[in-house]
Amino acid sequence: MVKYLHSMIRVADPAATVAFFELIGLKEVRRFDSEQGRFTLIFLAAPGQEGLAEVELTYNWPPEDGSPAEDYTGGRNFGHLAYRVENIYETCAALAAAGHIIHRPPRDGHMAFVKSPDGISVELLQDGYLEPAEPWASMANTGSW
């Protein structure tokens, strides 16, 4: 039997990334700091999905010698994470109010794309049907998603 566990993304700023996913509705379910390995693992899940479908945020600590931390770019080559949300318009409004660009607005009331602080593409899908509504219906795409 195969069971999905999680998707892992590397992050440069754990606090900013956790705050981003909290705006979507995920919650931190556990955290592990490895002094020996010099990394932190943070697991997030939608309410009721703990242990079923999680996102693992991996933060590799800066080198002890003071050299620059690894720069994680090119998040688009990961593909994307997808979440069903209760109200796509409210979720996108909360993300936009927090300074996140809605790269593919929910013009159809069904689907939107945003990026995490680390450039990971996140697809938002409406749970159920919503009529197309302004200002979203007439917004153009911004950048890649």
Predicted regions: what is each one?
Residues 2, 8-52:
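Core segments of cupin and vicinal oxygen chelate
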Residues 4-6, 76-80:
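Eukaryotic phosphotyrosine signaling hubs
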Residues 31-33, 40-43, 83, 89-145:
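Vicinal oxygen chelate
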Residues 39-40, 63-70, 132-133:
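A short, acidic/glycine-rich surface segment
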Residues 49-50, 61-64, 130:
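Active-site/binding-pocket entry motifs
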Residues 66, 79-80, 100:
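A contiguous binding-surface segment within folded domains or other stable secondary-structure elements
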Residues 70-71, 78:
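Short secondary-structure subsegments characteristic of cysteine-rich extracellular domains
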